[in-house]
């Protein structure tokens, strides 16, 4: 993996090296996996990846905010957001890796 960002191409290459499928098959596998996660979230379902974390769609209610340009109050519309909460296993792994 190059740099500090893991990309789809990096995932495909890692699967190719680990599993030995063709790069094209690995790309299809990664794309299908990400599509399944996205489709579940579109339906409002929770995606739990054991040992990794939980992706969840949450509803945020309307609230009063502020226009950053003018400083005047402005209503922020209700919306849906995607949240991610890392599992305890993932948190511990990151703490060990970062010397925490």
From Swiss-Prot:
Answer whether the UniProt record assigns the keyword Nucleus to this protein.
no
Disulfides per UniProt: none
Q: Which CDD domains match?
A: IHF_A (cd13835)
- One of the GO biological process terms: DNA recombination
List cellular component terms (GO). cytosol
Question: Which keywords annotate this record?
Answer: DNA recombination, DNA-binding, Transcription, Transcription regulation, Translation regulation
- Protein's UniProt keywords contain NADP: no
GO terms for molecular function, please? DNA binding; structural constituent of chromatin
| SUPFAM superfamilies recorded | IHF-like DNA-binding proteins
Annotated Pfam families: Bac_DNA_binding
- Superkingdom classification of source: Bacteria
The protein's assembly and partners = Heterodimer of an alpha and a beta chain.
Give the similarity note: Belongs to the bacterial histone-like protein family.
Q: What is the purpose of this protein? A: This protein is one of the two subunits of integration host factor, a specific DNA-binding protein that functions in genetic recombination as well as in transcriptional and translational control.
The name on file for this protein is Integration host factor subunit alpha
Give the organism the record lists: Caulobacter sp. (strain K31)
This chain is encoded by the gene named ihfA
